[in-house]
Amino acid sequence: METLNLFVRSIFIDNMVFAFFFGMCSYIAVSKSVKTAMGLGAAVIFVMAMTVPLNYLLNEYVLAPNALVEGVDLSFLTFIVFIAVIASFVQLVEMVVEKFSPSLYNQLGIFLPLIAVNCAIMGGSLFMQQKVVAGEIDSLFQSIVYGLGSGLGWAIAIVMMAAIRERLQYSHIPAGLKGPGIAFIITGLMGIAFMIFSGIQL
């Protein structure tokens, strides 16, 4: 039940976009089309589902104080190691997408490799580390669940935004609010709507 609660919280309550406003650059830029948003969302789910558990293992058995050698604390390498792991998986995703879906690769453009520095993905690993200290994550399986849930939450957010923005193309929006302006307002409203999930315990 704790694992299910962790999964639900990572999607709805601790949503990377609506709760922390992480990954906003690609969220705003790529959310103009549902198809493109789904492609980037799938890439983010994969990268987070892979990197969070891998970073969990590195944190537990290499970086944590006394993990590798008694009396040695390598936690100062956390950011470098986490970013290296994330960048490696993003490179793998980029090669796969370019090989099997050139059209999606061209639509995503620079934002696909930019997943490597997407603060939502880095945030997932850092929040995982925080939850390990707090005792909310205490196994590899729970880290996989958290990574998958966090990625799914971000993907749901960008697909919802893309669906709304596709409809907005046929609406009369004041000139000053067109583009990112209205997108930020809608994101704020959706964030408020997602607050209804706060306090849910399974």
Where are these regions (language model features)?
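Ordered, amphipathic secondary-structure segments that act as subunit-interaction surfaces
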Residues: E60-L108
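Interfacial loop-to-transmembrane junctions
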Residues: E166-I185
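Juxtamembrane transmembrane-helix termini in multi-pass membrane transport proteins
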Residues: N5-F46
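Cytoplasmic-side transmembrane-helix entry/capping segments in multi-pass membrane proteins
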Residues: T36-F46, L77-F82, L104-I115, G176-I182
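C-terminal ends of transmembrane helices
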Residues: F22-T36, V90-L104, M161-H172
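Hydrophobic core segments of alpha-helical transmembrane domains in multi-pass membrane transport
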Residues: F22-S26, V44-M50, I83-L92, V117-G124, ...
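Generic transmembrane alpha-helix signature in multi-pass membrane proteins
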Residues: F21-A29, E94-F100, F111-L114, C119-G135
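Structural signature of hydrophobic alpha-helical transmembrane segments
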Residues: N5-A19, V72-I86, I144-A157
